[in-house]
Amino acid sequence: MLSKATLLLFLPSWARVTYAAFGITTTSSSYVIDANSPNPLKFTVNRSNCDITSINFYGAELQYQGTGSHIGSGLGSASVSATQSGDYIKVTCSTSTLTHYFVVHNGDPIIHMATYITAEPSIGELRFIARLNNELLPNEEPFGEVSNTSGGTAIEGSDVFLVNGQTRSKFYSSERFIDDHRHCVSGSAHRVCMILNQYESSSGGPFHRDINTNNGGQYNALYWYMNSGHVQTEANRMGLHGPYSMYFSRSGTPGTNIDTSFFANLDIQGYVPDSARGKVSGKASGADSTFKWVVHWYNDEAQYWTYTASDGSFTSPAMKPGTYTMVYYQGEYKVASTSVSVSAGSTTTKNISGSVTTGKTIFKIGEWDGQPTGFRNAANQLRMHPSDSRMSSWGPLTYTVGSSSLSDFPMAIFKSVNSPVTIKFTASSSQTGAATLRIGTTLSFAGGRPQVTVNSWTGPIPSAPKDLNSRGVTRGAYRGLGEVYDVAIPAGTIVAGTNTITISVVSGSSGDAFLSPNFIFDCVELFQ
């Protein structure tokens, strides 16, 4: 095999990139880390605050020079040290409640990271943000320009913009945690990807989503949000977040199966090797097989998940020892829950079974999948604001059972925009007895919940759902706590022939347009 030096002899002078030895160069203000990778990667860490101030990859400066890359909006000050042990370099940045690590393996163009916390940062979220040169890295992957807000005019808060007639936001770059293994920024000659293989100390479960990328004009931001207040459904977890990896390449997209087991030998606080973990295996059954099935484990310290195989069989990721709540989902709709204990070095067998149970259905609008799939504007809501001109009319809409399309029913109703939604249906004489209208929702905002009328009868106002204190539908989120409301309809209320149901948003709060109280539909079913 030819050496690097020999290969350089065959390159024209303009194409040569200088190679240096793997190691640390220490200056009065910084540590300069050379990864000794074939496509050279060298980055600089500020010794007083842990900011990355330079990322030189294949001869190009990829770091935005106005502000560094860092945890949160920067640690301000930290105790920073760097050590080399054989083929590994570790930079350790410590404050009273946080320790952040940069780890480099000799020859790899990757900055591995992990973040250990004993308290939530004062800004109320835990993230790493790489602020990158958007002249060389203008693109965002995989969702493209939906989160490019450069040159935009703010239309909601400071995070939703109008750009060339389209609504855009950094929130529209999100992906469900269970599917988000890699997100990137790129240009014609460079690509930088965040590789995510460990969510155990994050919060929100398999279907939570958060900001991934944002070209905001000054720089292109590549994020890893470990937790935040963005439609957060559970308490933040302490301990070690990661490992997570920032991978530098020229044109190729890196794979997501990165081995970081070497962290076990680097004295990383809170790191638990596979040898000290256990697994759960078993079989899920009972749910509708037209949907993907997910099994989810969680406790106060960790969370894990996996898709099942087509026959329902599953094996968990390697888990920290402990007792977990184990949940089985049809799509994103919970159909069963149990408890399981995990021990180090062993696999626990635990089956789980459940299904959606209602009654004799008179009509059903949508499916019990925990998502607004198929409803009007659901296909666009993840990537644009409800006010976007590309959205279909929100109504108020009328849905006629038996003749309307699913897209004639709104994915959400807003108190000041399209409330109520009207449902018309025909009942037989045998269907005039007592019935239940079950309204599945996925997310509520500002206390919004449904109140029902059936013909001349008005149902009760439900108690207010838990306030997540976060904008949702306008920032591309649809999943919250998934409240389900059962409305008991007295016998004789439904008549033989034509009937009319209205579902309205009720709340003690108010707001303008799409920031008025609202909720998102999962499914609406009338049964006896």
From Swiss-Prot:
| Presence of keyword Nucleotide-binding | no
> Where would you say this protein principally sits, based on its record?
secreted
* Pfam families listed in its UniProt record: CBM-like, fn3_3, RhgB_N
Sorted UniProt keywords: Carbohydrate metabolism, Cell wall biogenesis/degradation, Disulfide bond, Glycoprotein, Lyase, Polysaccharide degradation, Secreted, Signal
User: Which cysteines form disulfides?
Assistant: 50-93, 184-193
The reaction(s) annotated as catalysed by this protein in its Swiss-Prot or TrEMBL entry are: Endotype eliminative cleavage of L-alpha-rhamnopyranosyl-(1->4)-alpha-D-galactopyranosyluronic acid bonds of rhamnogalacturonan I domains in ramified hairy regions of pectin leaving L-rhamnopyranose at the reducing end and 4-deoxy-4,5-unsaturated D-galactopyranosyluronic acid at the non-reducing end
The Gene Ontology terms for molecular function here are: carbohydrate binding; carbon-oxygen lyase activity, acting on polysaccharides; rhamnogalacturonan endolyase activity
InterPro entries given for it? Carb-bd-like_fold, Gal_mutarotase_sf_dom, Galactose-bd-like_sf, GH-type_carb-bd, RG-lyase_II, RG-lyase_III, Rhamnogalacturonase_B, RhgB_N
Region forming the signal peptide: 1-20
The places in or outside the cell where this protein is found are: Secreted
What EC number(s) is this enzyme filed under? 4.2.2.23
The record's annotation in Gene3D superfamilies points to:
2.70.98.10, Carboxypeptidase-like, regulatory domain, Galactose-binding domain-like
Checking CDD domains in the record gives: RGL4_C (cd10317), RGL4_M (cd10316), RGL4_N (cd10320)
Q: What GO cellular component term, any one, is given? A: extracellular region
This protein is called Probable rhamnogalacturonate lyase A
Q: What is the organism of origin for this protein?
A: Aspergillus fumigatus (strain ATCC MYA-4609 / CBS 101355 / FGSC A1100 / Af293)
Q: Which gene is transcribed and translated to give this protein?
A: rglA
